[in-house]
């Protein structure tokens, strides 16, 4: 692979300060050992900042890791149940501890509104199971909010999942057909719905990249809130 991640220990939420400190210190020791045992020069090595929701531990961990010759830095241990406000607070704080000339990777965080926030804090990389996991359970992202394809109201709906989407799924298949595939247990349902959700995320990231080039955020918070809060669609 082009990038290798060091071993780390991610504590659950909530975790006491002693548990979080032990985990953070173990993560730093593993990071140092990764540098000492490194053999490949053609592979970037990323460290992972841990420390739970404790800012003093995050700062201590970041200071230790930044002093080592890593090509990039990840922030782990978020998106584990701490809630949106605390996630944003710790993500913003930790990003400010990392160098601007190397990639910042926010691990395991993948809601569109969280990605938008994180990009504004300087994060470059993300990973999350959300688009594929939601697709398998019939939950689809659209420009008007989340759509649950399993709902009976879509059984005769000839429209695509999202009329503003140009993905293969939306160009060739109706909501009614997708619902039929889903309720009958056809594997094609997961395939098409995964394609759609990944295409949605591709569009989100494309708009964010365009916004960075133009020094503005195109994927607006209002639309993010719509995606997050919509329950009846």
Task: List the predicted regions and their residue ranges.
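Generic secondary-structure signature for well-ordered alpha-helical cores
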Residues: 32, 36-39, 96-99, 183, ...
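Residue-level recognition of short, well-ordered coil/turn positions
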Residues: 1, 39, 123, 186, ...
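C-terminal extensions of enzymes
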Residues: 8-14, 162-233
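Non-catalytic, usually N-terminal nucleic-acid engagement modules in DNA/RNA processing proteins
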Residues: 1-39, 152-155
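Predominant activation on well-ordered alpha-helical scaffold segments within soluble catalytic domains
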Residues: 28, 32, 88, 95, ...
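Glycine- and acidic
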Residues: 12-17, 21, 72-78, 187-190
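Generic structural signal for well-ordered, non-membrane alpha-helical segments
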Residues: 20-27, 58, 87, 171, ...
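Glycine-rich phosphate/ribose-binding loops and adjacent secondary-structure elements
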Residues: 25-28, 37-161
């Amino acid at each position: 692979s082009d990038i290798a991640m060091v071993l780390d220990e991610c504590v659950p939420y909530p975790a006491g300060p002693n548990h979080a400190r032990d985990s953070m210190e173990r993560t730093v020791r593993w990071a140092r050992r990764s540098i000492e045992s490194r053999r490949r020069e053609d592979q970037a090595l990323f460290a992972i900042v841990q420390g739970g929701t404790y800012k003093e531990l995050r700062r201590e961990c970041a200071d230790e890791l930044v002093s080592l010759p890593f090509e990039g830095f990840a922030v782990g241990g978020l998106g584990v149940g701490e809630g949106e406000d605390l996630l944003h607070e710790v993500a913003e704080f930790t990003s400010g501890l990392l160098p601007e000339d190397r990639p910042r990777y926010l691990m395991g965080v993948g809601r569109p509104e969280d990605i938008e926030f994180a990009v504004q804090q300087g994060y470059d990389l993300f990973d999350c199971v959300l688009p594929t996991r939601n697709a398998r359970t019939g939950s689809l992202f659209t420009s008007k909010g989340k759509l649950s394809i399993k709902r009976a109201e879509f059984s005769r709906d000839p429209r695509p999942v999202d009329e503003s989407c140009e993905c293969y799924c939306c160009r060739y298949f109706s909501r009614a057909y997708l619902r039929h595939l889903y309720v009958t247990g056809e594997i094609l349902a997961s395939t098409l719905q995964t394609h759609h959700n990944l295409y949605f995320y591709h569009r989100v990231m494309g708009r964010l990249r365009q916004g960075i080039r133009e020094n503005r955020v195109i994927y607006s918070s209002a639309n993010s809130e719509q995606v997050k809060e919509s329950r009846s669609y």
